[in-house]
A protein has these predicted regions:
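Cytosolic, membrane-interface loops and tails of multi-pass inner-membrane proteins
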Residues: 22-54, 113, 230-260
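Membrane-interfacial helical/loop segments at transmembrane boundaries in membrane proteins
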Residues: 83, 172-204
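N-terminal signal-anchor transmembrane alpha helix
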Residues: 1-28
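Interfacial segments of multi-pass membrane proteins
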Residues: 46-51, 72-76, 98, 117-149, ...
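Short, non-helical or kinked segments that cap or interrupt transmembrane helices
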Residues: 31-42, 107-121, 151-162
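Loop-to-transmembrane alpha-helix initiation sites
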Residues: 133-138, 152-160, 203-214
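Multi-pass membrane catalytic core of lipid/isoprenoid biosynthesis enzymes
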Residues: 47-73
Length: 260
C-alpha cells in the first residue's frame, strides 16, 4: 500500500461536497431546499426548473464523483487493471466513498446534501475497470425499472441493490477467463504473474474489497431513499414527467429530512 493514498480522501470529500443543485437553483432565483421535496439533487431541480437543469445537475454531480477516483487511480497506478491488491483497493474505494459522503453530508449546507446516486455512479466509473462494469450493469437496471414504473427513486434503489451482484459477476467472470487462458498455455515463462498464480491456485480474491464496498454503497443509497420508497407505497411519490401535476413540484414547502 502506498501511504500517499490518504491525501486523496479529503480532496475527494471536498469535491463531492460541492452542491451543484443548490448553486444552479440560486443562479435561477430559487432555494431548491424550499421547493418541492426540498432535495438538492437533479430530480427535484428538474421538477422545479425543467429537464435541461436536471441534465446539467446530473452531469455535474456525476463528474465530481468521476474525477477524484480517476485521478487517484492514475497517480497511484491502479487505473486500468482488475488486479489490485486489497490494501490499495480499499484505499481507492475509500476515495470513491469519500466523494459520495461529501455529496450526502456537504458541510456547506449544514451537512445536509443529496442521496449520492449521480455522484456514486461517476465515482464508480472512475474505478476502471473494476467498478465501471458494475456501474454499467446498475445503469441498465435503472433504465429498465424507470421505463416500467416511472419512479426515479425506485429505479435508483433497484440499481443500487444490483451493484453487489454485478460486482460479484464481473470478478467471477474475470477469474474464469484468466483460468481458461492460463490452462491453454504451456510457456509459463511468458505468462503474466496472475495467470501463473491461477494455475497454482494461489491467486488472491481481488474482488472481495470491491464486493464489500459495493454492498456498503448499496445500503447507503437505499437508506437515503427510504422516504421515497415509503411514499411509493402510499401512492404519493411523483413519477417522472409529473412536473406540472405533482403538487410538490410546483409549490414551496419546508425541506424534509429525506434529501436527494
Amino acid at each position: 500500500m502506498n501511504p500517499q493514498w490518504w491525501m486523496f480522501i479529503p480532496i475527494a470529500f471536498l469535491a463531492g461536497s460541492v452542491p451543484f443543485g443548490f448553486l444552479i437553483g440560486r443562479l435561477n432565483g430559487i432555494d431548491i431546499r424550499t421547493v418541492g421535496s426540498g432535495n438538492i439533487g437533479a430530480t427535484n431541480l428538474g421538477r422545479a426548473l425543467g429537464k435541461r437543469f436536471f441534465y446539467a445537475c446530473f452531469f455535474l454531480d456525476m463528474t465530481k464523483g468521476l474525477m477524484p477516483t480517476l485521478i487517484a487511480g492514475h497517480f497511484m497506478g491502479t487505473l486500468g487493471t482488475m488486479r489490485v491488491e486489497a490494501p490499495d483497493a480499499f484505499w481507492w474505494l475509500g476515495v470513491m466513498l469519500a466523494t459520495v459522503l461529501g455529496h450526502i453530508f456537504t458541510p456547506w449546507l449544514g451537512f445536509k446534501g443529496g442521496k449520492g446516486v449521480a455522484t456514486g455512479m461517476g465515482a464508480m466509473i472512475g474505478v476502471m475497470p473494476a467498478m465501471t462494469l458494475p456501474a454499467a450493469g446498475g445503469l441498465v437496471v435503472f433504465l429498465v425499472v424507470l421505463s416500467l414504473w416511472r419512479y426515479v427513486s425506485l429505479a435508483s434503489s433497484a440499481a443500487a441493490a444490483s451493484l453487489p451482484m454485478w460486482t460479484w459477476l464481473v470478478f467471477s467472470q474475470y477469474h474464469t477467463l484468466m483460468t481458461r487462458q492460463a490452462s491453454t498455455r504451456t510457456d509459463w515463462e511468458h505468462l503474466p504473474a496472475e495467470q501463473i498464480e491461477l494455475i497454482k491456485g494461489e491467486i488472491p480474491n481481488y474482488g472481495m474489497p470491491f464486493f464489500v464496498v459495493s454492498l456498503m454503497l448499496a445500503i447507503l443509497v437505499i437508506y437515503k431513499h427510504r422516504g421515497n420508497l415509503g411514499r411509493i407505497m402510499v401512492g404519493t411519490e411523483p413519477q417522472i414527467g409529473d412536473r406540472g401535476s405533482a403538487p410538490e413540484a410546483i409549490s414551496p414547502m419546508p425541506p424534509t429530512a429525506d434529501t436527494e
